[in-house]
Curated annotation (Swiss-Prot), chains A, B:
HAMAP family: FttA. The lineage of its organism: Archaea, Methanobacteriati, Methanobacteriota, Stenosarchaea group, Methanomicrobia. It is an enzyme of class 3 (hydrolase). It comes from Methanosarcina mazei (strain ATCC BAA-159 / DSM 3647 / Goe1 / Go1 / JCM 11833 / OCM 88). The keyword Methyltransferase does not apply. Keywords: DNA-binding, Endonuclease, Exonuclease, Hydrolase, Metal-binding, Nuclease, RNA-binding, Transcription, Transcription regulation, Transcription termination, Zinc. This is Transcription termination factor FttA. The gene is fttA. GO terms for biological process: DNA-templated transcription termination. Zn(2+) 1 binds at H242, H244, H329, D352. Homodimer. Interacts with RNA polymerase (RNAP), interacts with the Spt4-Spt5 complex.
Length: 637, 637
């Protein structure tokens, strides 16, 4: 059936299901959802159940778009909204898009604009006709969030066209009589870096992640040139499980080589992704490396990104529904559940996950309506890869920082911008608040502050305890006064030239560049100071050398000459802050999965880790399993 | 390097290696070989070593093409050839192709035209300039062979263009830095029928077999629509391991859907392939089934077919060399050995094979210069799938026929046209010659006689004993007077209406149509007659029903009504004539393979057979192994 007929058919169905007197003028697909055009938005707003019932009946997501002719003027609308919405919500901006009939309201407390079960939103529509969409005013100013929102506002027309195209493609007719499901491993198998998988059926092709291995020139890129994925315009959708570069660093490259389809990820992943992609090409340029794509491709990616919240079942292809679930790894990280066909097969890509409650996140979800195949990460899959408990790691950190401060020293913590930094920040904030460590400034340098701002913008993606603290008690730990962003060369020099007891969190996490190096150079020779590692240090990095006990570190000086830096500062390795499940958690995750899966494939770990984990899953849990190899295709059904 | 530069480079190299005074005018690729153009064919013919040494030096196959201006006239040439060549060779025709400078000589005894180590051929060139190519005059008239030869002669120009294109594609430059080898299963895994595999590297894609499952509408076709193979113009070469329809029946479909490249197979496979393809679409049309392609596509396939003899190492892609070896299954059946890269990986596709000497063929070859991966058939892979020894099968057949004849009866043997028929013929001929069964006519009906004619045209592809019998003793068993082809409806009616003790071999092999049904109807009610099964009877066929013991067989009468046929004739099942290795032979084939392979994948058998064989190969031979699944891709390197 041609798509126009599908739409006509849907329109008839909807009209049959509408209450008497409520009319629509048209229907259209807009990305994964169906939108209804109406001259009577107020009637729809009158009864919150109309849309809900339609969505249930048609088993799809539905939104309503008012006719521009029935809308109040923006001026009138603003004064009405400010009457309807409680002042405490603190609205910071409005953006009216007559084309979609949406008004985007930025508020400090979005919940108050939404009202109970959306009652306030409906009231707004009833009075002004416009459909309000609410976003949070970032509690910490974020350049990234601001730029993304502006960019999206400036490209609404193009965006609408993209969504229309995507929507019509998703809802095309299924044509094949065959039924099969395959997964092709394109990167990240028996290795870490360049994660990339293709999920395919006779109808559809879905790419899951498209990472870059920044540590390798030879194996930097997934095998994107194989016929299963190339030409890229045959791909239906790209899924990004989380924002780390080894999972999404080359998504813009797909657009450079002809991909034109949607990118699905959670809203925080979208924001972090833009931040990390721009930083990636920026760093590559500064290091004189080949830049795989220009910032224009980052923008193009953003234009094509469709954010999906956790637990939102979404059609992404004629025969595939995607649902994201919390993965507990970093902000917005998602376990991706694919429901294929009408009950044909269910496959879960875990992406990176943490099966333990951490300071920031709930443990990864492992309860699904159905699941036959699991493709699981295996970073700590080695038989003996146990990590200390988080509580112990935290105590260790507290002790190290306390000792350093008390002897008048400075604790320098190299950290990745996204993930462990925020975890460590929460621990430090609580320790200071509770008096467990002295009240000293915690400096945040590099992208850490910006990444933290993005965390603060998406509190819904943090765990229960943190959300309670923020929403109910009004205590946002990220806003604590102990945190001091370092936002200029001068600010950094001030800290260096007038050293006082403090904690410094700075990038990069493995000391292969970034502001952390300046602090290190300044503070390495004083034995009162401490260098605290909270993350994994790869071979070949300076961090690794220091861990090995090097006492003299060669540094490139200002004029290019090599100077030897004397290491007198204390070195402490605090294990246990990993965002990955350790061996025990990996096994528990599978063991406690509901329902029990039929087979588990392992990936994202060195060869031994992947094989060890697979072998144990088979031996201990009696589940069919295998470590995947790049470039192989497995048949799931 | 552009291909023109490659050729120029080759020309310089050749000129440097030529003896003083011998010159060439040009070089060009022609399929997998390099051809030299010269005005001095006589000088090349003078010294047989010139071409041989060049081929060794350049590690490629080389042929020489004389300039048309230096050739004798056809008339003069014929009289000179007839002076040079012994009369006993019995030349039946000449075809002069001035474009290639070749003269095709058809002779009853090609060996006498060739001379020792090609001495007579060289003498011919020395005297007339033309390059002689010798083919055998079919000892039994074969419509197929005649038509193919005529067709090829009539399309020499187009053929030359095809070979040039193929040759230039084979010798293109390798561009990828990656090194990997993959095999994708497209059909024939955990099933029999529609065999099809894709062998791929970063440089090349080779399709091995493209069969049709004639017994199934649903699973008739391999998975050709997947992106690894489609669009088909990206495939470098198609290999046909043998002529049965489940291995080659859909090769013409590839051309219908855009394939334009070469098809490699042995010369007998080519001839049998044309016969069986034309019969396949003919039968389908008669049965009112959908015809997958027209005869024009059979012709197109033939135009693109490049025959290769056993043991001939041939470049088929920039990084792949193919060598066929005897598989012992049917005439021309080949084990395909692929050497990939410069010593990178070696993979053997067994196709169907018999690892035992039979009346017609030597046992399948399992000695290779190198081999890492084997993809083996598993038709009789079941743990208990043992077949009686051939000797016992032959004795059983002799006894059955003897008893039938001696009681004045007729032995009706349903048989496939290609394979078992000729095996049974040889046994019957010898039995009659040696007086083990009475001297009665052996009628051959259906395509059996035509297929036998193709066997007689290619005696080089029969085993040592048969070749000796034919070439040294001048006894071609296929020419025995006991064999009586039935070539018309009238001839068949004569046999039926005046029944005399005799043997009748007729198609189809499973009694689902064909002339065998007319004999069956005529002779089923007389208990003196015997129905002798020598091949497998699939479920749902009349043959299978009779084997199960049905005593009344429903038959469609002339006016479409169903008549019940009373089964009074004796039924005998003679096991052991299979062209497939039985379980013991499959295991022995792998066990005695030299060198020992690193891994074995199984295919071409029902699921249990494939899994059983794989499991035993692992347990008993300690070789990594797995039963392949359709649509999966395995990484070999």
């Amino acid at each position: 059936m041609p798509i126009e007929d599908v739409l006509l058919d849907l329109k008839h169905k909807i009209e049959k299901n509408l209450p008497a007197g409520v009319t629509i003028t048209d229907v259209e697909f807009e990305g994964p959802q169906l939108v209804l055009y109406t001259e009577e938005p107020r009637k729809f707003a009158d009864d919150g159940n109309i849309i809900r019932n339609l969505a249930k009946e048609l088993r799809t997501r539905i939104a309503m778009r008012p006719d521009p002719r029935v809308l109040a003027t923006p001026e009138d609308s603003i004064s009405i909204i400010e009457e309807v919405v409680p002042k405490e919500s603190v609205i910071s901006s409005y953006y009216f898009d007559p084309d979609s009939g949406e008004v985007i309201i930025e508020a400090e407390k979005p919940g108050l604009v939404i009202g109970k079960h959306g009652a306030t939103l409906r009231e707004i529509t009833k009075q002004i006709g416009w459909i309000p969409k609410v976003v949070r005013t970032p509690p910490i100013k974020s350049r990234t969030v601001k730029n993304i929102r502006e960019f999206m506002r400036n490209n609404l027309k193009e965006r609408k066209e993209i969504l229309k195209t995507v929507g019509r493609k998703i809802h095309r007719e299924c044509t094949s009589k065959d039924q099969w499901v395959r997964v092709t491993a394109l990167g990240g198998c028996k290795e870490v870096g360049r994660s990339c998988f293709l999920l395919s059926t006779p109808e559809s092709r879905i790419l899951i992640d498209c990472g870059v291995n920044v540590g390798s020139d030879e194996n930097m890129t997934p095998y994107l040139y194989v016929p299963e994925v190339f030409p890229l315009n045959q791909i239906d959708a790209v899924i990004v499980t989380h924002a780390h570069l080894d999972h999404q660093g080359l998504v813009p490259l797909l657009f450079k080589y002809g991909y034109e389809g949607p990118v699905y990820c959670t809203p925080p992943t979208r924001d972090l992704m833009v931040l990390l992609q721009l930083d990636y090409i920026d760093v590559a340029a500064k290091e004189g490396k080949k830049i795989p794509y220009e910032s224009g491709m980052v923008a193009k990616t953003l234009k094509h990104t469709i954010p999906l919240d956790y637990e939102e079942v979404t059609d992404i292809a004629p025969d595939i529904k995607l649902t994201f679930h919390n993965a507990g790894h970093i902000l917005g990280s998602a376990i991706s559940h694919f429901h294929i066909g009408d009950g044909l097969h269910n496959v879960v890509f875990t992406g990176d996950y943490k099966y333990e409650k951490t300071r920031l996140f709930d443990p990864a979800v492992n309860k699904f309506p159905r699941v036959e195949t699991v493709i699981s990460e295996a970073t700590y899959g080695n038989a003996n890869a146990f990590q200390p408990a988080l509580k112990d790691a935290e105590k260790h950190l507290q002790m190290v920082v306390k000792n350093t401060i008390e002897r008048g020293g400075i604790a320098v913590i190299p950290a990745f911008a996204v993930g462990r930094s925020q975890e460590v920040m929460i621990v430090l904030e609580e320790s200071i608040r509770k008096g467990l460590i002295p009240e000293v400034p915690v400096y945040l340098d590099g992208m850490i502050w910006e990444a933290t701002a993005i965390h603060a913008t998406h509190p819904e993606y943090l765990n229960n305890d943190l959300r309670k603290l923020i929403f109910q008690k009004g205590q946002n730990p990220f806003l604590s006064e102990c945190f001091k962003p370092v936002d200029s060369h001068e600010a950094r020099q001030k800290i260096i030239q007038n050293p006082q007891p403090c904690v410094i969190l700075a990038t990069s996490g493995m000391m292969n560049g970034g502001p952390v190096m300046e602090y290190f150079k300044a503070f390495a020779e004083d034995p009162r100071n401490t260098l605290v590692f909270v993350g994994y240090q790869a071979d070949g990095t300076i961090g690794r050398r220091i861990q090995k006990g090097w006492k003299e570190i060669p540094m490139t000086g200002k004029n290019g000459s090599t100077e030897m830096l004397k290491m007198n500062m204390e070195v402490q390795v605090v294990d246990g802050f990993s965002g990955h499940s350790d061996r025990r958690q990996l096994m528990e995750y599978v063991k406690r999965m509901q329902p029990r899966p039929e087979r588990v494939f392992t990936e994202h770990g060195d060869e031994k880790a992947c094989v060890d984990l697979a072998s144990s899953v088979y031996k201990k849990l009696k589940i069919e399993t295998r470590a995947l190899t790049n470039l192989e295709t497995v048949r799931l059904l």
